[in-house]
């Protein structure tokens, strides 16, 4: 184990939609890496129970995607509440990173943070206010070095743990291909 204020917390959420005022979190996962993007530990992967009334708010894309991945079935079977998911995740993170030190890391992570702020403020408060958003680097690369993007592709399973692993791999790719580090 390597507890450090230099470790990075990666998080991904799957939600019933894109509006935190209307939709809910249905899955979350975390990974901790060191500052060199080496995976140190994978946190709990949690399907969060939501009532049918919340699942009914999903649009066609969410319903199709989350049903095909098996996530909807896992959410229906889950007994884990949002508060329990927070407690499990914080117990994991506290082993690896002090509170307030790691930026929140991921792809389009601002969207995840909006949901955390609304539905899981205790967990959101554990992160530093800064972001490491891989999608920002992707958008800059698309504009400044578009040929580089042809060298990397993602599967896009829309399962939280898989998405985090892909985000880390994507940042490792940009580190070598764009930043030449």
UniProtKB/Swiss-Prot annotation:
The keyword Cytoplasm applies. Its main location: cytoplasm. InterPro entries: Exonuclease_RNaseT/DNA_pol3, Oligoribonuclease, RNaseH-like_sf, RNaseH_sf. One of its GO terms (molecular function) is nucleic acid binding. GO terms for biological process: DNA metabolic process. It comes from the Bacteria. Residues 8-171 form the Exonuclease domain. Keywords: Cytoplasm, Exonuclease, Hydrolase, Nuclease. Its EC number is 3.1.15.-. The active site is at 129. CDD domains: Orn. It is an enzyme of class 3 (hydrolase). Pfam families: RNase_T (PF00929). One of its GO terms (cellular component) is cytoplasm. Belongs to the oligoribonuclease family. This is Oligoribonuclease. The gene is orn.
């Amino acid at each position: 184990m390597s507890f450090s204020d230099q470790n990075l917390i990666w998080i991904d959420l799957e939600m019933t939609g894109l509006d935190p005022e209307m939709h809910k979190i249905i899955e979350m996962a975390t990974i901790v890496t060191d500052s060199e993007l080496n995976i140190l530990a994978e946190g709990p992967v949690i399907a969060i129970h939501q009532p049918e009334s919340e699942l009914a708010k999903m649009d066609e894309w969410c319903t199709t995607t989350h049903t095909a991945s098996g996530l909807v079935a896992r959410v229906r079977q889950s007994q884990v509440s949002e508060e329990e998911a927070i407690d499990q995740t914080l117990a994991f993170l506290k082993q690896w990173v002090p509170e307030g030190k790691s930026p929140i890391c991921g792809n389009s992570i601002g969207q995840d943070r909006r949901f955390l702020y609304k539905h899981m403020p205790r967990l959101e408060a554990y992160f530093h206010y800064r972001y490491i958003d891989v999608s920002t680097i992707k958008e800059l690369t698309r504009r400044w070095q578009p040929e580089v993007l042809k060298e990397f592709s993602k599967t896009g399973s829309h399962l939280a743990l898989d998405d985090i692993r892909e985000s880390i791999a994507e940042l490792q790719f940009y580190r070598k291909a764009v930043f030449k580090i």
